[in-house]
Amino acid sequence: MGQAATHDANNYTSINYTEIYDVIEDEKDVCAVADEPNIPCSFGISLAVPEWEAICTAIILTMIIISTVVGNILVILSVFTYKPLRIVQNFFIVSLAVADLTVAILVLPLNVAYSILGQWVFGIYVCKMWLTCDIMCCTSSILNLCAIALDRYWAITDPINYAQKRTLERVLFMIGIVWILSLVISSPPLLGWNDWPEVFEPDTPCRLTSQPGFVIFSSSGSFYIPLVIMTVVYFEIYLATKKRLRDRAKATKISTISSGRNKYETKESDPNDQDSVSSDANPNEHQGGTRLVAENEKKHRTRKLTPKKKPKRRYWSKDDKSHNKLIIPILSNENSVTDIGENLENRNTSSESNSKETHEDNMIEITEAAPVKIQKRPKQNQTNAVYQFIEEKQRISLTRERRAARTLGIIMGVFVVCWLPFFVIYLVIPFCVSCCLSNKFINFITWLGYVNSALNPLIYTIFNMDFRRAFKKLLFIKC
């Protein structure tokens, strides 16, 4: 009885160990499928893939590296050499191009060798620095996209105030924050937050740490938080642009109705005429605006678009050779005309001595981007031409805003397509022990993320006329 019991117990124990052993072996077999064998080639080195595949892979990846380097260098040179692009907000694009350029120079070449050879032959210290640069440069590229989205959001939703706040110091400060955050996110593995082996053999894989805490920390800071910010910001940009379209349509409708009720005219200058048209003595000075007089039977309607400074003005006389032209110096903020205030006042113009003071009060100031000359026409036609000109400039301004928002949306869409697969796998692997993916698949989603650094300059070239012209100029291509 006791012997039978012992036999049954031994049997039970034996069966249990056998089952556990079989499960372990099965898991090893499953993961072993993911490991690519080293294949000898005619060059005398071992490859992770067949020779023809290694050659094709090397050619394709080298082309990606070259296009990334050339494209981002062109972006940087364009901003510094092409005058229309030499504006403060484009320093964000320069920072993005620098991040993408460092990815192409410091990260991609070693990854090409690692992908083809199937083993890391550069030592443990190069491995650690390479992985750190990989995280830092890719994070910087993503955070720069986030900064560009925020900059565009503030420029569209609060153009007047943000135009004053958007100084070189502020932009450089934001860029500095981007790079500091990238360094903070990428450096913890160097300080001990890793699961790297202490002894690094030739066949030891050089991989990102799979420490769960760091994976959550780095993936959140590098991708998921910026993704949420960019999604919210882009949605707000869409709503703001849509609202401005509706407001612009309403304003156009109101101005059309009011133009039928009130009679606006521009008069030739006359020394004795109180309602003369004033302009800058020098048409190259863009700080002020021409003033038009609004006449009504009972009272003058005054509507001001105030500039920062009042330039020196002169009143034209009949002997002035230029009195047949209406010169409108234009000063624009964000390429649009903004109503700052509206005031209705009744003015008595009883004497000629105070006619200039009255003229200063009962005027409409119009500001825009460049000096424009309008030939003398009949009074009503002149007024219609001025308002048509303003409406056209407003329409062009809004078109530019929509185009910039669309470009930002395309950049964000490409960013999500390129990086989302990698960060999903990166976040899942530490928590899924039985998930064994092939090296080819890992290399594919990794390089899909790297391709984002090559696509950003192409997006600028396709959707931005100024960058397109700058690229042609740098490449000596006649427009």
Curated annotation (Swiss-Prot):
Q: Where is this region: Disordered?
A: 260-319
Q: Any ranges marked Cytoplasmic in the topology annotation, and which?
A: 81-90, 151-170, 241-407, 463-479
Q: Which PROSITE patterns match?
A: G_PROTEIN_RECEP_F1_1, G_PROTEIN_RECEP_F1_2
InterPro entries registered for this protein in UniProt? GPCR_Rhodpsn (IPR000276), GPCR_Rhodpsn_7TM (IPR017452), Octopmn_rcpt (IPR002002)
Q: Could you tell me the membrane topology recorded for this protein?
A: Multi-pass membrane protein
Alphabetically ordered keywords of this record: Cell membrane, G-protein coupled receptor, Glycoprotein, Membrane, Receptor, Transducer, Transmembrane, Transmembrane helix
Q: What does this protein do?
A: Receptor for octopamine. Octopamine (OA) is a neurotransmitter, neurohormone, and neuromodulator in invertebrates. The activity of this receptor is mediated by G proteins which activate adenylyl cyclase.
* Protein name, per record: Octopamine receptor
